[in-house]
Every structure is written in structure tokens, then in C-alpha cells.
């Protein structure tokens, strides 16, 4: 990537829409825009919007709004011009072609964000958060990405960096004055411990952050032929699972994504629980039991028209809901239990609204206050912080056993890893790998 050239790209998704945005950034952005816009772009003040015509080679392309943001007060830190034209394919494509013909280069994926990073407008954590905002598949993932983009994670990383620097400075003073027989190491010990506490807090949040980003897992379980697959289809409002009256039809775990009021749920349909001599069905039942243990919650489906068998003990070890299916045929004999129970019909939809409301309330209660804290969701961040924790633990354990110079080496290694996180120590190849995942125009 050449930092001194000017790049251009369409910043909105392709297809029909009310408007499309073409973005231009670089030292020649204003000069190039001035050559195709009817107004005098060079004379426009920064952060102003102007209505005019886009004309190239004496041909009118479109009437558009032009937004000008002069360096350094722009997202990339460079001169930025955006054309807001009519949506669809042709207007924005012709504007982009004109900009390229006049000297702009087609932007690479994520290149606008990469320039923002290289110009110090955002750090690498914030740059990665931009991509996570775009690809978020539920409201929790979006909010977590938002906390990262707002700099909350970066502030904690800076706090860790400062604590390590302060501990390192103290140790370097001791190394310069070795005549001190019994140096007081309480100060670096406290700094290292505080830094390690923050790092370990983030590491421990990784699994929960992943769960929030990926969605809550709910498993549909129960005896064979109670209507689990019919219920899956009813909740998804589409025929996803095969429904028959033959017990044991479902053998593999069937997973579907279900978006419920912005909450992403991984809905799993499993084999019915029964004793069988069929080896393939046995394997499906074993997988279902394993999935029940790993799931966040269980929807245990019961046939209200059949005699009730004992409930499995696992229902009382994690959030579980009893769904009495076929309630359109007979009133269900509710149990005297603490588990929430619902009379439903996968066939008519009876009771499904109440089930959805209960699931939403349960998830909101489970996640109350969680998305306001900073979670670790990136595997890259997780791996780096594990290395930081290792270095800090080594320094902590050897603080009274090794010379200050040896402890300082561990702390410098921790600082290097912190730099990999923020982007201060990152290599060109890693940057390329990160930003290549972005869409063009971002």
C-alpha cells in the first residue's frame, strides 16, 4: 500500500437502495473531486455538504451531495470526499470509474480503516472492532464491538502497559545501583500483580464473550415422536426438519440460527431419548445427551396426549423449560415442579408467544449488565493476553529469586506482546491479514 496515493471505493452494499456512497481519500482527493463536481470543491470549508452535479467528460452522471472532510479532521486522517448519489449500480459505478480515470486507485479491502490506523486516528483494537460491528449477527455482539470501538478495551490495555512500564522503571533503577543489599520490591510486585489481575480478568471473559457473540444455545430434547422437529419448524416459521410419525427419524443434531428480538439463538434439534438396539440411533442419542450438557438451556418437549415418563436429572442442573406439546388435543397435566411449563401446539402455534417471551426474559436476566463490561471476543487478543499473563507470572514468581535484569526481560517481552495487541509492534503481514477481512470501502 502506498500511503501517498489517493484511493476510491463504493462504500455502500451493491444493489437497489435510496442512496449510494462513493468514498475518496488521499492527498489528491480534493483536486480529483473538483474536476467532476459542478461546484468549486477546493473552496469548500471542511465538514460541509454541497448539492451539485457530477460531470465527467462533458457527460452528466448524476446529481449528488458532496461531503468534504479536510485532513486531519477525517476518519482516515487524510483529505476525504464522499459522493452521495442515487442508489443502484450505475450512478456510483460511473462516479468511481471517473475518479479512477482521474488518478485515484481502487481501494483494497479495509484500506480506509488501515489508513486511519496508520495515521493514528484509531488503534488496532478499534480497527478490528469496526469489522466486528459490520459482521455482528446479534445485538450482544454489536454492543461488545461498540465498547471496543469506543476505546474501552484500549484504555485497559494502556493501563496494563503503564503498570508494566512503572514496574520496569523501578527494576532498571535497581539494576543501575546493585549495591543495594535488600531492595524494597513491594512497588514492582504491586504493579505486576495489578497488571496481571486485569489481564486475567480479560482472559476469563473470553468464553462468555464468545457465547454472547455466537448466540445462546438452546436444545430441543425429549422422547421420540413428541414433536421436537415440528416445534423447530414452528419456531423458525419454515420447514427445516423432516417431520414423520416414525420414532427415531432425527439422528444427527440439526442446528439452526434463530433471531429472537435481536437475540441470536442457536437452536438444536436432537434425537429422541429412548432405549434402542439401532446402532445409528444410539449414536444420535449419545450426541444429543452430550449436546444437552453443553447447551445454555433445554427445551424439553413432552407429548401431552401420552403418559409421562420420569424427567431426566439434567433438567434440574441448568435452565430448562417444559413444553407440553399437542395441547390443542388435550389439556396438559402440569407437574408440581419449579421448572417453567407451557402448554403449546407446534401444529397451531398455541402457546409459542408465551414461550418466546419467557426465553427473552431469561436471556435478559442472564445477560443483565454483561454487555456493558468489556469482553474479550477475538482469538488473536486472547492468544496475545495469554502470553502477557505468562510473562507477568514468570516475573512475579522470580521477583525475589532472580536479578532485576532477568525480571526486566520478562516485562519487556510482555510489553512487546501488548504492542502486538494495540498495533505498536505489529508486522506488515499481520496488518495485511487483519484488514484483508474488511469489505472494500471501509
From Swiss-Prot:
K(+) binds at residues 225, 244, 246, 249. It is an enzyme of class 3 (hydrolase). GTP binds at residues 225-230, 244-250, 269-272, 325-328. This is tRNA modification GTPase MnmE. Homodimer. Heterotetramer of two MnmE and two MnmG subunits. Exhibits a very high intrinsic GTPase hydrolysis rate. Involved in the addition of a carboxymethylaminomethyl (cmnm) group at the wobble position (U34) of certain tRNAs, forming tRNA-cmnm(5)s(2)U34. Keywords: Cytoplasm, GTP-binding, Hydrolase, Magnesium, Metal-binding, Nucleotide-binding, Potassium, tRNA processing. It comes from Chlamydia pneumoniae (Chlamydophila pneumoniae). Its cofactor is K(+). GO terms for cellular component: cytosol. Mg(2+) binds at residues 229, 250. Binds 1 potassium ion per subunit. Residues 215-364 form the TrmE-type G domain. InterPro entries: G_TrmE (IPR031168), GTP-bd (IPR006073), GTP-bd_TrmE_N (IPR018948), GTPase_MnmE (IPR004520), MnmE_dom2 (IPR027368), MnmE_helical (IPR025867), P-loop_NTPase (IPR027417), Small_GTP-bd (IPR005225). The lineage of its organism: Bacteria, Pseudomonadati, Chlamydiota, Chlamydiia, Chlamydiales. It is found in: Cytoplasm. HAMAP family: GTPase_MnmE. GO terms for biological process: tRNA methylation; tRNA wobble uridine modification. (6S)-5-formyl-5,6,7,8-tetrahydrofolate binds at residues 23, 82, 121, 442. It comes from the Bacteria. Belongs to the TRAFAC class TrmE-Era-EngA-EngB-Septin-like GTPase superfamily. TrmE GTPase family. Its main location: cytoplasm. Its EC number is 3.6.-.-.
